[in-house]
Amino acid sequence: MKVYSIEELHNLIVNQEIDLNEYYYDLFKEVEFQQNRLNAFVTITKTQAMDNIKELKISDEEILKGIPGVFKDNYNTKGIKTTASSKMLEDYVPVYDAAVVEKLYNEGVSLIGKSSMDELAMGVLTNP
């Protein structure tokens, strides 16, 4: 799958040089392939992302509209499991979005999944 910068993908979408549905279809094929190799996602949000892009009206000024995004699994995402890779949060489904998630959604970012992380973001530090 070809990789684009945000600006490149935005321009392709706005100029109708790429079909957003086909792009996301190919993107999720790649996500599923890489998930089997790397186990990089805690949650994959294919249905939500595909539903989201159906409703989008993209203009030249809205640079993030239609752009796929991945959030670490410690950011609250309303209605989508948020575990922070912790057993004690394995069933937690937030009733609100984190402020940064809300801002990115308002800009038109389409969530494709929640990425794995060290439990509760408490990984080993290597700073001196």
What are the residue ranges of the model-derived segments?
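Gly/Ser-rich catalytic/binding loops embedded in alpha/beta enzyme cores
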Residues: 1-128
